[in-house]
Amino acid sequence: MNVTKKQAYIIGGIALVGLGVGAYFLFKKDSGEYDEKAAEKQANAPEVTVGKTGVKVKATPEYREELLKFAKSTELKETTRALLNNMNMSWIGRDKEQIKSLIYDRIATDDHMKILKAYFHCHKFSHGIYNKCWDLTYWLKHALGSDDWNAMTLKYPSLQIPLVCSCKK
């Protein structure tokens, strides 16, 4: 096989680029993979209040900005509106899978859940024998089955702490 010097350099360059691309994909961190430096930075972060929500979280400045953006987002308002629409349906018309997908798809972390709880606050619920003023915690506890509720509290531990509600009549 006759290969000129120019062709050898081209083949070598392509091989080198291929090795670089292969090494990148081999050694890159997967999204969601544990990052020790980021975890240490988050653990040493000061506790701050997120905007006007009154929610206190340990957050780095970047994470605090992300939480502030979420607290002001239309996604938070749309999620709350969808949950309230579902809350006002009768027990027969309620779709547990829709409730779970709303929360799991739109609420990334427990800190985001704290903001949703603060925004949702307390609402009057009156269907059948119930005529109660519930926060998000009590409503989800009654709307979901025990297995779904337990799974949700594992991902969002702040759901275990209900708000004290008193709706005016």
Residues of each region from the PLM?
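Single-pass alpha-helical membrane anchors
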Residues: 2-30
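Long, charge-enriched amphipathic alpha-helical scaffolds and associated charged IDRs
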Residues: 27-169
